[in-house]
């Protein structure tokens, strides 16, 4: 009898320790999420401020463009001759440089910065995702005798040559914007895959990237449905190389019962609407909450 009571007490204490551990882990995650939301709100305010500055710089660039067009118009009309024509060309070149400087300053607010060199400009494209600064890429763009890329650190699977062919000669601003979209989306997908690999092996396993662009990701993860453990397999497809979130999430499970399929459907939407690691954190928290509730009910029955 005494042995039974001792075992019972040990079971109760063990159960209480489990509840305490679950509560602590849940509190830590909630605090982490609160801090992340606070940082996100701060970043959103910063974005609004930077957009305002960007719009001011856009207006400044447009004024420079108008002045350049005015100089070109006077040249075509033959208003300037001899040394006056040389002065006009010099002034127009200076305005072009001012336009380029203003453009680079504007892009710096959105991840692109640059500095003048003897032959042109050196551009740095800095990528970020969810407030985390990621990789930076560099390009040396020559402006003389013609516009072209002399050196760069862009990965070979980014279609730099195609983007340059379409935009570099005619619209430098468009060229930088399109290239930034490609690089920033790639860095965001790569970052999410790295975050995926940081999850415990008991929750996420067999994480793999389908290609260098990280446009296909596969992994398995464990969940509980109706208090039973199941292993789900996920395949995330990014339909465009400028996307940071998947266009399709294919999730499979060997068990076809309705409750499992319902869980799969909700997870598919979650993966397509949120960064990968955020979606998995939500799934993990949901699973721990269910386990916590089940343990609490078990404790009630024990007493």
Swiss-Prot record:
It is found in: Nucleus; Chromosome, Centromere. The gene is cenpo. The keyword Coiled coil applies. This is Centromere protein O. It holds the Pfam family CENP-O. Keywords: Centromere, Chromosome, Coiled coil, Nucleus. InterPro entries: CENP-O (IPR018464). Belongs to the CENP-O/MCM21 family. GO terms for biological process: centromere complex assembly. Probable component of a centromeric complex involved in assembly of kinetochore proteins, mitotic progression and chromosome segregation. Transmembrane segments: none annotated. GO terms for cellular component: kinetochore; nucleus. The lineage of its organism: Eukaryota, Metazoa, Chordata, Craniata, Vertebrata. It comes from the Eukaryota. Residues 38-77 form a coiled coil.
């Amino acid at each position: 009898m005494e042995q039974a009571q001792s075992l019972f007490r040990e079971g109760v204490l063990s159960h209480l320790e489990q509840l305490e551990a679950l509560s602590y882990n849940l509190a830590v995650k909630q605090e982490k999420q609160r801090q992340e939301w606070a940082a996100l709100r701060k970043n959103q305010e910063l974005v609004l401020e930077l957009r305002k500055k960007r719009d001011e710089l856009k207006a400044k660039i447009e004024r420079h463009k108008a002045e350049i067009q005015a100089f070109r118009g006077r040249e075509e009309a033959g208003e300037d001759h001899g040394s006056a024509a040389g002065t006009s060309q010099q002034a127009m070149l200076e305005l072009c440089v001012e336009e380029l400087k203003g453009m680079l300053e504007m892009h710096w607010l959105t991840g692109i910065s640059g500095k003048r060199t003897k032959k042109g400009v050196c551009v740095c494209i800095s990528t970020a995702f969810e407030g985390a600064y990621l990789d930076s890429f560099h390009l040396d763009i020559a402006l003389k005798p013609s516009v072209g890329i002399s050196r760069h650190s862009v990965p070979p699977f980014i279609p730099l040559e195609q983007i340059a062919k379409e935009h570099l000669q005619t619209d430098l601003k468009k060229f930088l914007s399109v290239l930034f979209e490609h690089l920033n989306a790639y860095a965001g997908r790569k970052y999410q895959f790295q975050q995926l690999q940081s999850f415990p092996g008991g929750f996420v396993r067999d994480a793999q990237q389908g290609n260098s662009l990280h446009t296909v990701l596969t992994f398995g993860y464990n969940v509980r449905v109706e208090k039973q453990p199941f292993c789900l397999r996920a395949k995330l497809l990014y339909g465009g190389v400028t996307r940071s979130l998947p266009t399709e999430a294919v999730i499979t499970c060997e068990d076809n019962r309705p409750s499992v399929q319902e869980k799969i459907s909700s997870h598919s939407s979650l993966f397509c609407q949120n960064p990968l690691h955020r979606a998995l954190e939500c799934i993990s928290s949901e699973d721990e909450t269910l386990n916590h509730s089940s343990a609490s009910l078990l404790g009630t029955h024990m007493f």
